[in-house]
Amino acid sequence: MKHPTRTTRLAVPALAFALALAATACAGGKQDEKGAANSGKGGRLTIATGPTTGVYYQIGGGLAELISDNLDGYRATAATTGASVQNIQGLQAGSYDIAFSLLDTAQDAVEGKGSFDKPQSIEALTRLYPNYTQILVRADSGITSLRDMRGKRISTGAPNSGTEVIARRLLSAAGLDPVKDVSAQRLALPESVDAMKDNTIDALIWSGGLPTSGVTDLVTSLKDKVRFLDVTAQLPALSNTHGGVYQKGTIPAAVYHQPADVPTIVVPNVLLVKKGFDPRLAGKIADLVYDKKNALEKVNAAATEIDPAQAGNTAPVPLNPGAANALKTLTQRP
C-alpha cells in the first residue's frame, strides 16, 4: 500500500466546485429523472458522500464533476450525508444513485447484520482508497490507550456513519462497552472538531482518507494540545471478530506535520450502487474513476491511493456486471 508523503493542498477550483455541487444537491430529485438515469437514458445522478470536512465529500464532488463533464445527458450532484450506513440506506430507498461506503459497513449490509436487519441489494462499481482510523485525544486527557477512554467524553462519529461502526468495534475490542463505559457523543466531524477546540470532549474517533481537512484544521489550531493515538493493539481482536477487512497502516508524519509516523488501522472504501443499476452506465463511471484519476487527486491526495490492481477487490460485495467488465481492462491500459 502506498502512502502519501506530504500534505497536498486542495485544488481551489476543484474544491469550490465540489462545495457548490454538494450545497445544491437534492437527495431525492425527480423520480422520473432519476429512474431514467439509473436505466442509462440520461438524467440526474445523486452521489451520497459524507460530512463537509471529510474526504468523501471532496472526492464525491470531484466525481460528480467528472460525470457531468464527460457523460452526455447526465448531471451529477454530491449530497452531504452522515456517510456509510446512511448512504446505503439511501441507496435502498432510492434517495441516492451512487454511494461512498467503508467496506466493513458494506459487508454488514450484504450480510444483513450490524446496522442492517436484512441483506441489502447493493453492488460495487469499484474499490477506492483506504480510510485511516484517526483518533485524536487532548494532551491533558490522560488517554494513552483506548482502555483509558473509560468514563471519558468521546466523539464516536455521526449517527449512521462508518466512523461510528468502527468506533464501537474498537471500543469493544479494548474491552469497553461503547454505550455504558464511555460518554459517547455522536457527532459529525465538523462538530467533533469544534468540541475538541472548546474542550467539551476528550477525544474524537474518525475514519477518513489522508489528508482529512477537518483533522488538518484541528491539529493546526490546537498544535501540541492534541495528539494521535496508536490503536493497532486492537487489530487482532478486530480481525478475529470481523475478518480480514481491517489491516495495519501508517499515517505518515508529514501529512499532519506530526513528530513521527502514527501506526493505525485501515479499511478500504468502495463505490456502491443499488442492484439493477444500468451496467453500461456502471462501466462508464468505473472507467472515469481511473481514466480521470488525476483530476480526483487534485481535489484530495487520498485519491492517489486508488489502486487499479485492487479495483475489483470488493468482496463480499459483488461487482456490478458492467463495472466488472470495465475493470478487467485496467491493467492493460497505458
Regions found by a protein language model. Name each.
Residues 103, 112-115, 141, 178-271, ...:
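Pocket-lining segment of extracytoplasmic ligand-binding domains
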Residues 61-65, 77-118, 135, 190-195, ...:
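Pocket-flanking alpha-helical
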Residues 27-30:
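Bacterial signal peptide processing site
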Residues 44-70, 74, 78, 130-198, ...:
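Bilobed "Venus flytrap"/periplasmic-binding protein-like clamshell domains
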Residues 262-334:
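Segments of small-molecule ligand-sensing domains
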Residues 22-25:
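C-terminal motif of bacterial Sec signal peptides marking the signal peptidase cleavage site
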Residues 2-14:
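Bacterial N-terminal signal peptides that target proteins for export
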Residues 42, 73, 83, 93, ...:
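Extracytoplasmic
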